[in-house]
Amino acid sequence: MFAAWTEFERTHFNTCEPDVAGLIIHPAETVSALAYLVAAVVVWRTSASVDRTFPVRLCPFILVVIAVTSVLFHASSAAIFQKIDLMAILLLTNLLLVTSLAHTGYITLNWWLPLFVGVSVATSLLTFLETGLGFLIATLESIAIIYCWHHLPRKDSVTKHQLRTLICLITPGAVLLGLGHAGIGCLTNGMAAHILQPHVVWHILSS
């Protein structure tokens, strides 16, 4: 383990990849987290013409934050950086949930920003106090988001296709995330253990 990482408490929510001595403890999971940077660029380019007051303009920034915090966590496998990584992920799920509630008519669009800020402060505090609460909140929010997406007005085949694609990517990705933390389906020997793991696939699918 890199000397600097020994100063931090090891995470209790381990992932599959075996440790490697050096600066980057889990190389495959660290490198795969860079997929969020690619997603950030794609969203930024596709939303460049959107009004700056729209929630989607926050997505590229949040995705960059997720990429940075995820790289830091997987490189160190430190508990504190896992908390920060989870807080960043919750920023995205909070934004998706609040905007989904607005688009489905549960709240007015004028309320999305104060509600997003309030929920983000609350989820960050809860995650800082107990990492497990952060995982629980992210799971419940994801279920609520999928529920809202299912009930969005779907007036054309393109929208329906986009929603199906999102759900088909996120659902198996989330299952793999859970399996990885449970130690199920892990590759433990040889170079393959540092190439393909459930958490690696989660990064790619969720990005």
Residue ranges and their predicted role:
Residues M1-S207:
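Multi-pass alpha-helical transmembrane bundles in non-GPCR membrane proteins
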